[in-house]
């Protein structure tokens, strides 16, 4: 079977650049949307040119130009969007509604994978404000996709390793300390940590798979379902040293929101649901929607392997 042609929207972003690489690595004809809004951002322009050198095709388009989106979509079989939903960076989830309109008009897309890649928003109706907006907006996009009867796959990838493992699962830290760590409560709530390139690898595998059509797929590498304490213990073994540990209660953690910017408050509430509530592991996932069981051939990065880069 011929491999699908793919359009990546948001290809210069944190996850998007990895999605482009995984798409090329798996042999797909890959198009990357070159948005006019990039302007004179030299880093993004250079990244786009590097994609071209690796074999990707650049196609111009803009969320402010409906016709350009339609023409870009007509080039491919699959559209993957990775634009940011992170409040402290650039929160753009609802821009995807314009992409949905373009896909509906083009009429040729066999699969659309919108920008999800975190917690499953369908399970987060109880989420705290202001972070709840992220999940609500993703559900608005889902409804638009389903109302338009666009074939789709939603990918729930849980915790990006760089944001969580890098700081030993501490909010606001992305480099592991060799001296001390603050535990969230007792540190025993389990999370799921996934290398960002592995997220892309699994995602690309789902897009041509009839088993994943119109489903939510959960990326849950079994060896990476760990508590914060377990992550810290792995780091301690790597550095040959026991860290000084203190604990931050749920109440004290929530009190940190006072005086923070809206974006940081949103991020803090997401972290709360993961690290105190355990929202990623308080439900069972069926084999048919578990990416690690659908694609056992993927040699994913373990927590220990990921943390070695910080030594």
Curated annotation (Swiss-Prot):
NADP(+) binds at residues 10-16, 35, 44, 142. It holds the Pfam family NmrA. One of its GO terms (biological process) is (-)-secoisolariciresinol biosynthetic process. Substrate binds at residue 270. Induction: Transiently induced after wounding and by jasmonic acid (MeJA). After an exposition to UV-light, first transiently induced before fading out. Combinatorially expression of Sinopodophyllum hexandrum (mayapple) genes of the podophyllotoxin pathway (e.g. DIR, PLR, SDH, CYP719A23, OMT3, CYP71CU1, OMT1, 2-ODD, CYP71BE54 and CYP82D61) in Nicotiana benthamiana (tobacco) results in the production of the chemotherapeutic compound etoposide. Its EC number is 1.23.1.2, 1.23.1.1. Expressed in rhizomes, stems, and leaves. Pathway: Aromatic compound metabolism; phenylpropanoid biosynthesis. InterPro entries: NAD(P)-bd_dom_sf, NmrA-like, NmrA-type/Isoflavone_red_sf, PCBER-like. CDD domains: PCBER_SDR_a (cd05259). It comes from the Eukaryota. Belongs to the NmrA-type oxidoreductase family. Isoflavone reductase subfamily. Reductase involved in lignan biosynthesis. Also involved in the biosynthesis of etoposide, a chemotherapeutic compound of the topoisomerase inhibitor family. Catalyzes the enantioselective sequential conversion of (+)-pinoresinol into (+)-lariciresinol and of (+)-lariciresinol into (-)-secoisolariciresinol. Abstracts the 4R-hydride from the NADPH cofactor during catalysis. This is Bifunctional pinoresinol-lariciresinol reductase. The lineage of its organism: Eukaryota, Viridiplantae, Streptophyta, Embryophyta, Tracheophyta.
């Amino acid at each position: 079977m011929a491999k699908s042609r793919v359009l990546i929207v948001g290809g210069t972003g944190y996850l998007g650049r990895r999605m482009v690489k995984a798409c090329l690595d798996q042999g797909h004809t890959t198009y990357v949307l070159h948005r006019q809004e990039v302007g004179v951002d030299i880093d993004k322009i250079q990244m786009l040119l590097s994609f071209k050198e690796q074999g990707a095709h650049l196609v111009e388009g803009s969320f402010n130009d409906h016709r350009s989106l339609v023409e870009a979509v007509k080039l491919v079989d699959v559209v993957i969007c990775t634009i940011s939903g992170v409040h402290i960076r650039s929160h753009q989830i609802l821009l995807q509604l314009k992409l949905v309109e373009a896909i509906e008009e083009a009429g040729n897309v066999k699969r659309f994978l919108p920008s999800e890649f975190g917690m499953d928003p369908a399970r987060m109706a109880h989420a705290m404000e202001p972070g709840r907006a992220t999940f609500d907006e993703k559900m608005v996009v889902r409804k638009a996709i389903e109302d338009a009867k666009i074939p789709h796959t939603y990918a729930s990838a849980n915790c990006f390793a760089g944001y969580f493992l890098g700081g030993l699962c501490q909010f606001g830290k992305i480099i592991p300390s060799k001296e001390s760590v603050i535990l969230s409560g007792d540190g025993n709530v389990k999370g799921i940590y996934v290398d960002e390139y592995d997220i892309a690898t699994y995602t690309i595998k789902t897009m041509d798979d009839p088993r994943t059509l119109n489903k939510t797929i959960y990326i849950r590498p079994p060896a990476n379902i760990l508590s914060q304490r377990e992550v810290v213990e792995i780091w301690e073994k790597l550095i040959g040293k026991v860290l000084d540990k203190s604990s931050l209660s749920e109440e004290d953690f929530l009190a940190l929101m006072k005086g923070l910017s809206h974006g940081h408050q949103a991020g803090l509430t997401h972290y709360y649901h993961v690290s105190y509530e355990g929202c990623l592991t308080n439900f069972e996932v069926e084999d048919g929607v578990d990416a690690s069981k659908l694609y056992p051939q993927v040699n994913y990065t373990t927590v220990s392997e990921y943390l070695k880069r910080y030594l």
